[in-house]
């Protein structure tokens, strides 16, 4: 599967990059079974609530009580019960867990599943840790980027973060693994930077995914696109992005996803969410949540009750974050987009 089984936590991203054919077939096979049997396609493990940043658009930030966090040995039980084809490891900031490599190893099944994505701000990333996590089973590294310069530091409230990314990402991209994707959450603050951020991805030699801000996490509507001028900037920015696509598929979002993102911002809503069914969150202390912005908690063995109580009656239309946007499609559409993207990548 080339690109589009995708997901998000604080800055959620499930955007599958390049996957070998045998692994693609396993993912498609499990995804088909899960779709038919109402199991989740994507599970996001929020392995910590603590974070190194205090991002303006997020409800995480700073130290938290870590005493009740799941241990690495707890993860196989969740994997056996949920059997997702894609896993997102997120937070908070997952790199704050010193045992993160062990957690990743305990998520793996040994047969190429699940496809595993690390969502991080990369403030604590080093070359050694990148290589260790690749070896443990991380297939893709999703790195948050809000601005193409040190305004990123101000938005994330982390001085020096952009300089750290600018120094490290091109160096790791040059290793040739093609497993780094910048994730840019579009807000009223950075909507005019859509293509400048794309320029940065190109300059650093990595891929790019866009996601959409939701006010549900913090209650702050200031970062939504609240004016015709901002919507015009979004549309002109995405028009240019569409022109920049090429055979490398470095723009990870499918055209259908960007089109739906435009509609979300235009209407300030996106009905029809299947949180809890197609995707779900496992919190740092092991509870199930339908998503990272719906806070009803369920035990692992009560997943079916969560679907019945929440998903079947869910009227929330307040987000179009990545974890939702890439699964908010019919199964034939989801399958065809993944197969088409895979064949495009293999044909290079």
Summary of predicted features, one role per range:
Residues 57, 61-64, 279, 297, ...:
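Secreted/processed peptides and extracellular or luminal domains of membrane proteins
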């Amino acid at each position: 599967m080339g690109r589009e089984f995708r997901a998000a936590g604080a800055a959620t991203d499930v955007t599958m990059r390049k996957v070998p054919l045998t692994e693609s077939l396993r993912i498609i096979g499990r995804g088909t079974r899960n779709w038919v049997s109402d199991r989740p396609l994507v599970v996001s493990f929020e392995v910590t609530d603590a974070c190194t940043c205090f991002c303006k658009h997020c409800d995480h930030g700073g130290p938290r009580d870590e005493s009740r966090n799941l241990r690495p040995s707890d993860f196989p039980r969740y994997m056996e019960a949920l059997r997702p084809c894609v896993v997102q490891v997120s937070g908070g900031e997952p790199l704050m867990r010193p045992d993160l490599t062990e957690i990743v190893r305990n998520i793996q099944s040994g047969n190429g599943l699940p496809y595993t994505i690390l969502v991080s701000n990369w403030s604590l990333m080093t070359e050694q840790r990148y290589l260790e996590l690749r070896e443990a089973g991380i297939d893709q590294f999703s790195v948050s980027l809000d601005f193409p310069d040190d305004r990123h530091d101000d938005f994330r409230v982390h001085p020096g973060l952009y300089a750290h990314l600018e120094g490290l990402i091109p160096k790791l991209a040059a290793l040739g693994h093609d497993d780094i994707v910048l994730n840019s959450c579009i807000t009223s603050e950075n909507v005019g930077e859509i293509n400048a951020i794309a320029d940065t991805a190109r300059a650093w030699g990595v891929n790019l995914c866009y996601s959409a801000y939701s006010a549900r996490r913090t209650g702050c509507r200031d970062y939504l696109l609240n004016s015709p001028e901002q919507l015009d900037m979004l549309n002109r920015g995405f028009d240019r992005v569409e022109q920049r696509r090429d055979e490398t598929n470095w723009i990870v979002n499918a055209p259908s996803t960007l089109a739906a993102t435009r509609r979300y911002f235009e209407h300030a809503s996106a009905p029809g969410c299947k949180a809890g069914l197609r995707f779900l969150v496992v919190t740092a202390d092991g509870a199930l949540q339908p998503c990272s912005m719906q806070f009803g908690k369920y035990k692992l063995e009560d997943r079916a009750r969560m679907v019945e109580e929440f998903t079947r009656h869910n009227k929330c239309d307040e987000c179009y974050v990545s974890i939702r946007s890439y699964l908010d499609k019919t199964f034939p559409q989801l399958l065809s987009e993944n197969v088409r993207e895979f064949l495009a990548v293999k044909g290079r």
